[in-house]
């Protein structure tokens, strides 16, 4: 972010540098001169003279053929492009913060799923222990129930480590210390429930929302202006030069009207030979314009690809969530039925174990799908340059 801000400041300074060429350059000169001429170079005797002088001098290039004007336009486009770059950086930063937050909430929700399933598995373990103590089942059922429970609890430390990692990541992205935001984020929270279809408008409108596309277009405009300025350098340059001041032998006479001097000197400068410098400068500007056009085309293609991928990914993730919710609901029903049949001695304990493992897997998949859907939504936000209009 700081680098993008610095580039904006540099582009603004370059713009003002070019704009300054619209104005005359004015200088102040003052001095004292003592001059002695040789008596052996002419028939005139050797003389010594001295005088004081003070004057204002001016030099002004008249932008007849638009060289300065085109260079100012190029810097205006570059300045605007630097602001688009800053916008792009802020969009990316917002997307990174949102993604880290979603990943954090996803892990926290997975942790809740694990704890909830652990509690359910502990209840099943108690049931098997009661049935074992009454001689209704073998000790194998107890051992298998413990195995499933301990395996579920074993994932808790890894989830807690991931949660801590994302809290630290968020702190860095926000420019804060982890301990400053940990109390807020450790309290837990659910994933936002958003599954609405999104209308993004026409493709052309879509592309114009992206800062990188707008920036690439501005860069093309800047290079086109520089090519025009390079061609204008082939034409004559017109200058208006002049000076106004005072000169006198005695300092006390310096400001008298008879001491006034001035000079007005319009001039024309036209380079007719430069060893190929002008030709190659134009070729360079043309090559840089072609490069900017190619970069613009590539940026547009990348924008279309990223947006299409994000949109399709989001739409498919919604379908996956709907399907996984049905699977999860059936998993809950399966565990309930298998446990009831087991209690009645009508079904082996293996069916209960399979139902427990499946339900844990289904609920984790559902949480992960919800997190993935939100990440696809964030990717779509980024691909559209920071949002969309319905």
Show where each model-derived region lies:
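Bacterial Sec-pathway N-terminal export signals of envelope proteins
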Residues: 1-14, 191-221, 271-272, 300, ...
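Small/polar, glycine/serine/threonine/aspartate-rich low-complexity segments that form flexible
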Residues: 30-57, 180-199, 228, 241-281, ...
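Periplasmic alpha-helical coiled-coil/stalk elements that build and connect Gram-negative outer-membrane
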Residues: 68, 77, 83-202, 313, ...
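Short segments within alpha-helical structural elements
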Residues: 122-126, 150-179, 230, 317, ...
